[in-house]
């Protein structure tokens, strides 16, 4: 739809080591990962950039609102495509997925209990940025659907409990959805990647 609600900027991706068996590289978030050639399509994370509030604050500007998050030419293109019958979809970062990308699954799950102020700041940041980007765009363009990539569950259930959803994730989704639905958005799509029945 012409808006970037997730990471903007970031580190330059660099290859640290490239052998016949694997590639080790650093990505835009500053994570180091290892991909085994011929065996895997998803790299194995070797480290994560966020461990505490100080390390988060170094990356926070990549997630904060900036005017250049909105490409008005793309917004106008989306409007023209919508007139031809195409669905206009906006995406927002996952309320569990972004912390997991920054900290890894284990540290993310512990963060809800051990460093709740860190989790609150991450959530407030992605909420404010997503809201401001999509609020501006939806003044000029009807967004038909909002989609969120979460991957917060496996076949045996979710990686996050109902209390954490209620406290940290639901307010984020609710604020974005209430604003967009008041302007005509009708569809909310979340990729869970597994069984989310325990947190519905």
Question: How should each PLM-predicted stretch be described?
Answer:
Residues 12-13, 22:
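Short, acidic/polar N-cap/turn motifs at the starts of alpha helices
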Residues 27, 47-49:
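Cofactor-binding catalytic cores of oxidoreductases
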């Amino acid at each position: 739809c012409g808006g970037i609600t997730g990471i903007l900027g970031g580190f330059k991706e660099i290859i640290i080591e490239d052998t016949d068996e694997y590639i080790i590289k650093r990505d835009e978030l500053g994570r180091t990962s290892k991909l085994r050639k011929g065996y895997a399509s998803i790299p194995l994370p070797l480290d994560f950039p966020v461990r505490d509030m100080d390390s988060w604050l170094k990356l926070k500007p990549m997630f904060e609102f900036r005017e250049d998050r909105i490409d008005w030419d793309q917004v106008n293109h989306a409007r023209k495509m919508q007139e031809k019958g195409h669905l206009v979809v906006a995406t927002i970062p996952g309320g569990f997925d972004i912390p997991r990308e920054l900290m890894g699954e284990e540290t993310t799950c512990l963060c809800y209990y051990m460093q709740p102020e860190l989790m609150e700041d991450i959530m407030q940041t992605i909420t404010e940025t997503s809201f401001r980007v999509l609020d501006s765009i939806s003044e000029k363009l009807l967004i038909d659907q909002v989609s969120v990539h979460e991957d917060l569950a496996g076949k045996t259930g979710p990686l996050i409990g109902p209390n954490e959803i209620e406290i940290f994730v639901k307010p984020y989704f609710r604020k974005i959805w209430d604003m967009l639905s008041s302007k005509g958005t009708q569809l909310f799509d979340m990729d869970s990647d597994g069984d989310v029945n325990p947190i519905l």
